[in-house]
Amino acid sequence: RKHIIYMKMRKSLLLLTAAFMSFGAQAKVRLHHLVSDNMVLQCSSEARLWGWDTPGKTVRVSTSWSKDIVTARAAKDGSWEVCVRTPKPGFTPLTITFDDGEQTTIKGVLSGEVWVCAGQSNMEMPVHGFDGCPVEGYNDAVIDAANFSGVRYAKIPSRMSMSPEQDADTRW
């Protein structure tokens, strides 16, 4: 009798565990850190947007500037990507919605000129300078920055890796 009760409890526990695991498998779409609030898209072009989801899941992407809906299916590794046409440059904040059954919307997106700067140590210096070596006029530049809300900045951190990185901890 105890053995039967034990087996029923074990079966119930396994079913409960499987149910909780299936809820976890219904993961919400995850975006690359560059695809985030306040991002800037290169104007009048095609922009690549990408992220991850449950393998086989369909991701629908819609934008506030177009009626078009672009879709992608997550690959075996969960990765997906789409290309969307971008509007003319402007300072009107835009939105992009990603829908895999659960919506994720990024806000404050601008369409404009995107400049990528790269280099060595000269590109590592923060706007305020290094400790004990401030940049002349830094305080005035910070105060004046409030007048340029359309200028966005994203710093991709330097990391050493023996293999290509899939994401970078970056915010606009």
Question: What would you call each of these model-derived segments?
Answer:
Residues 17-25:
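Hydrophobic h-region of N-terminal signal peptides that target proteins for export
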Residues 28-172:
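Cell-envelope and extracellular/periplasmic
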Residues 1-8:
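Short, Lys/Arg-enriched N-terminal segments with co-localized hydrophobic residues
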Residues 8-9, 26-28:
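Intrinsically disordered, low-complexity sequence elements enriched in Ser/Thr/Gly/Pro
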Residues 10-15:
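Sec-dependent signal peptide recognition
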